[in-house]
Amino acid sequence: MASKVDYQSGKKHGLQLKNQESELDSIAAEFAGELDEATLSKYKTQFMSYDINNSGDIDHYELQLLMEKINQPKTYLELKKMIEQVDSTGKGAINFRDFIKMMTGKTSSILQKILMFEEMGKKSEQPKGIPQKRSISDLP
């Protein structure tokens, strides 16, 4: 008896990510006149990393995980209030348009400050390879 279980979910996930990325690109195109390509790309990457289930929205659960990741755990009501400050659709989740507006400062919120704080906390990439030669005159 053949099993009808689809073991190729990796392909489905890849397609889902590709579709989400194309949707986010089309939304980012709306902001192309206001922001440069590098900034929009950075926001898209951030949004995709926060949107764990690839639904196109950051919901309460995903925001809770983000806050716990940066050691700022919040209650359900605090998370709900943070989302309400940014949410323009009334769905109770942050879509990519709201995320860009929040990050560009068009809607100031505590969530914007927390996300910027998280970016500052990331370690910069260390140079790899052999260190450059220095002379005594280079020392402070």
Swiss-Prot record:
- Per UniProt, residues of the EF-hand domain are 38-73, 74-109
Question: Is this entry keyworded Calcium?
Answer: yes
Annotated source species? Dictyostelium discoideum
UniProt keywords (A-Z) are:
Calcium, Metal-binding, Repeat
A molecular-function term among this protein's GO annotations: calcium ion binding
Q: Mind telling me which Pfam families this protein's record contains?
A: AIF-1
Q: By what name is this protein known?
A: Calcium-binding protein B
Q: Which InterPro entries match?
A: AIF-1_EF_pair (IPR049025), AIF1/AIF1L (IPR042433), EF-hand-dom_pair (IPR011992), EF_Hand_1_Ca_BS (IPR018247), EF_hand_dom (IPR002048)
Query: Superkingdom of this entry's organism?
Result: Eukaryota
Q: Which residues bind Ca(2+)?
A: D51, N53, S55, D57, E62
The transmembrane segments are none
Q: Which SMART domains match?
A: EFh
What are the recorded Gene Ontology BP terms? Answer: actin filament bundle assembly; ruffle assembly
